[in-house]
Amino acid sequence: MSKLSRKQQTQKRHRRLRRHITGTSNRPRLAVFRSNNHIYAQLIDDAAQSTLCSASTVDKELRSGLKNNAGSCDASVAVGALVAKRAIAKGIEQVVFDRGGNLYHGRIKALADAAREAGLQF
């Protein structure tokens, strides 16, 4: 049996997590995707299969302020604050956090903490 790559391990964890985590219109799922260069966050209503709002380091609002640091913890903090601001503007205050199979530390934790500080509850 061959050893799984890091990406395969992440995908396996994500499939395992998604069995138990679902988002509704009242309490959507805050899904986080982390790549080497960027980080993406979206609020998803799984019942309606729709994205309610999203934010990422490729957004025009954040891109100019980040320069070449889109893969840093500071960028994750900015994305977390922006997605929380957009969610609260739509009347969403409670979410279910989906770390996307990634370990809860570093950039994922920074995004979650910033979203909590900006007013989201999870």
Curated annotation (Swiss-Prot):
So which domain of life are we looking at?
Bacteria
Instruction: Cite the CDD domains for this sequence.
Output: Ribosomal_L18_L5e
Question: What biological-process terms (Gene Ontology) are attached?
Answer: translation
Keywords of the record: Ribonucleoprotein, Ribosomal protein, RNA-binding, rRNA-binding
The record ties this protein, via Gene3D superfamilies, to:
3.30.420.100
* Classification via Pfam families: Ribosomal_L18p
One GO MF term attached to the UniProt entry:
5S rRNA binding
Regions of compositional bias (Basic residues) in chain numbering: 1-21
Task of the protein: This is one of the proteins that bind and probably mediate the attachment of the 5S RNA into the large ribosomal subunit, where it forms part of the central protuberance.
| Family designation | Belongs to the universal ribosomal protein uL18 family.
PANTHER family in the cross-refs: 39S RIBOSOMAL PROTEIN L18, MITOCHONDRIAL, LARGE RIBOSOMAL SUBUNIT PROTEIN UL18M
Q: How does it assemble?
A: Part of the 50S ribosomal subunit; part of the 5S rRNA/L5/L18/L25 subcomplex. Contacts the 5S and 23S rRNAs.
Q: What is this protein called?
A: Large ribosomal subunit protein uL18
**Can you name the source organism?**
Synechococcus sp. (strain CC9902)
Q: Which gene encodes it?
A: rplR
